[in-house]
Design a protein with these regions (language model features):
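A short alpha-helical cap/connector motif
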Residues: 1-119, 130-172
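Glycine-centered, small-residue-biased loops immediately flanking beta-strands
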Residues: 122
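Generic beta-sheet signal
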Residues: 126-127
């Protein structure tokens, strides 16, 4: 993605910066201090940096997610385990799990099987949601998903049944 396209995406989402418009304190904290955290963490310097800005930006997000949620089992289908382990040392990569704690997967048609194994504390990150918008919208509106965050480059879904369903656009 070139810098002009990046700038256009950012400008289009400018009114969704830093949690503006989010009424839920829990969701606001998640957006402000996990998704859009700008302070350098203790392990940022040790994390891989191959020059790809998007891979690095998403990797730092996965680091912050793991740091926040502290999962023991992670389903990683996109190769970000270095970032996840830096955020949670006890995390181990699994191919499959009875109950999902944290999953980072490419957006795909077979999401139904994955969502069936999600509990109230599960977090699933779908990558490249902008490439398959219709599929992302069907995931957002799935009855099992309670909170969905559209970050353009990826989507994060939560499953806490005590909360009212809500879908957010976040300028990431």
């Amino acid at each position: 993605m070139n810098s002009v396209t990046r700038a256009l995406v950012w400008i289009r989402r400018i009114f969704h910066c830093r949690g503006f418009g989010i009424q839920s304190p829990t969701d606001y904290r998640f957006v402000r201090y996990v998704i859009n955290e700008k302070w350098p963490y203790y392990a940022y310097d040790e994390l891989p940096n191959d020059g790809d800005w998007l891979k690095r930006k998403l990797g730092l997000l996965y680091f912050r997610l793991a740091n926040d949620r502290q999962p023991r089992r992670v389903i990683d289908k996109v190769g970000v385990m270095d970032f996840v382990r830096a955020g949670c040392r006890k995390a181990e990569r699994v191919e499959d799990a009875d109950e999902v704690e944290l999953a980072v997967v490419p957006i795909a048609q077979d999401y139904d099987r994955l969502l069936n194994r999600c509990g109230e504390q599960s977090v699933v990150v779908f990558q490249d949601i902008y490439k398959q918008k219709a599929l992302w919208q069907s995931i957002e509106h799935d009855r099992r998903v309670t909170v969905a965050f559209d970050l353009y480059y990826c989507g994060i879904v939560l499953f806490d049944k005590k909360r009212h369903p809500h879908h957010y656009i976040v300028n990431f």
